[in-house]
Amino acid sequence: MFNLALQPQSELKAQISQNYRRNEQECIQNLLTILDWNSDHETKIKQVATNLIQKVRDNRIDGKGVDALMQEFKLSSQEGIALMCLAESLLRIPDKYTQNKLIQDKIKTGDWRSHTYGDNFFVNASSWGLLLTGKLVSANDSASLTAGLIRTIGKFGEPVIRKSMETAVRFMGNQFVMGESIDKALKASIAPEKQGYQFSYDMLGEAALTDEDAQRYMESYINAIHSVGIANNGRGAKNGPGISVKLSAIHPRYSRAQRDRVMSELFPRLRHLFLLAKQYKIALFIDAEETERLEISLDLLEKLVLDEDLAGFDGIGFVIQAYQRRAPFVIDYVIDLAKRANNRIMVRLVKGAYWDSEIKRAQVDGQLDYPVYTRKFHTDLSYLACAKKMLGVEGHIYAAFATHNAYS
């Protein structure tokens, strides 16, 4: 049975619910009021962002290997899109027939010849390889001077192409994923940490469909906390590596409609993870998921923060999505919770990763409005307003920021 009884709410919690699908223009006006924007702010932001972008581009241009390759094949180009589609898809396809079809679809249309210039060996080698691959899976051009060579290579067929592409894409994937396991990721982080970088680790995976799934994910999180805790070596939640937990992975019925089960079954599991994190003095973040799960995640956060056994632990973390129209009210609530608990809460501000599904779900459900901003620059504006709120509070939250946007 579903528990649809309304829970008593504080004024701040009520504001979160009331602004679930608030009119977008009203939200923007509120954000502008929070920001109190002026031309001096804009000038300074442009200067800092321009310097950051130029430094990153210079490093990419001077870089070797995959960095140079990604700089060459931009995501706005047909070739860049083809490479990213392969990187996203090829590793997930188990059968060779479908892999061949994917190669045919994504590679044969690219203008790889236009990228065979410059002095970067990796880019040129990749371009020539992709050029030949594109010809191999397309119709032969008898007028081409390279037709004979292509037909010769064609004798080997798509298995050679498939294996070569698989190797190349796996190599590219290693540039973006720290490791296939937490231990491999920790090993890969040793050198960057010596340069001053800090890491927060995510356990990639889907939501649990059964309790058996949840128990398996739970064991993975426990092992990960042990590994990260040992690597942390007493540096504390603020100065060492941390980890994020996806609540839908440790309980198959993580929803407001199942609140009683969430509190009686999921919370003890979550509490166990946080107590373990406290032993190692590492940060553990409750990761953000779909918008309809926000209230129940805040209920769990409040119960954790007010738990006597977790008193004084400054590694309790919560992720807030700036693309939600009620994000500023969530920040107000978390700050108030930290004050009530007399304990600092770690807050990580992100843009949000479920935009497509949030828009589609609202449309399918016939909602009058959306829970997220419909325009990217509105989300950017929300991010800045939320960041200002977070940085304006001393002693109650530890602010962390995640963004790919130099202006943010």
Regions found by a protein language model. Give the residues of each.
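Positively charged, amphipathic and often flexible ligand-engagement surfaces
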Residues: 1-408
